[in-house]
């Protein structure tokens, strides 16, 4: 992460639990209009079939026009991610690339994406949030169901989402000039901020 350019297009941070520790990894995505009848899908560090499923769900259920796009995804540093908690940041990276819109450099995300584009809770949410806060991150996109009982570190905004479309709309602005996450932000005491 020390070499990470802040606010990169097509890059999102994913807190991944490996054994007894949480790691913050950068997932990267590049979308490009395909010149082929069957657009290419390339997965480095993530399961290829998972990428196919996430691209299909994002296209069909969340309105991302990915069907005519080549999609290349990568986990920086040569890491491999096998847990579904990286689903949400991976799709956010794809949306960022598709709309050519950088994600907030202080934002991280986690959550499993279901076939209906619902965002499902994953285990060890507290560990993920605590590790990200320790590294100075200030904004978290996570499953709404994970907010219950979660201790949000002081100075961090947690944005609970139910659907993939809601998550994308919260962080990727198609006009590239408006940060939508403020509309949905939760303060540590759980009070909804005015939008």
Where are these regions (language model features)?
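Peripheral, non-AAA+ core regions of ATP-driven protein-machinery
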Residues: 1-195
């Amino acid at each position: 992460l020390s070499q990470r350019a802040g606010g990169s297009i097509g890059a999102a941070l994913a807190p991944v639990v490996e054994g007894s520790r949480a790691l913050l990894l950068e997932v990267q995505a590049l979308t490009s209009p395909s010149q082929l009848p069957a657009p290419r899908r390339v997965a480095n560090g993530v399961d290829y079939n998972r990428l196919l499923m996430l691209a299909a769900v994002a296209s069909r259920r969340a309105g991302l026009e990915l069907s005519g796009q080549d999609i290349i995804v990568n986990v920086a540093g040569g890491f491999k991610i096998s847990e579904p908690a990286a689903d949400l940041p991976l799709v956010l990276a794809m949306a960022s690339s598709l709309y050519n819109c950088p994600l907030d450099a202080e934002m991280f995300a986690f959550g499993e994406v279901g076939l209906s584009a619902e965002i499902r809770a994953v285990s060890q949410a507290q560990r993920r949030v605590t590790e990200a806060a320790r590294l100075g991150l200030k904004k978290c996109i996570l499953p709404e169901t994970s907010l219950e009982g979660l201790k949000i570190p002081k100075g961090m905004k947690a944005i609970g989402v139910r659907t993939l479309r809601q998550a994308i709309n919260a962080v990727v602005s198609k006009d590239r000039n408006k940060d939508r996450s403020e509309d949905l932000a939760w303060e540590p005491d759980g009070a909804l901020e005015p939008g």
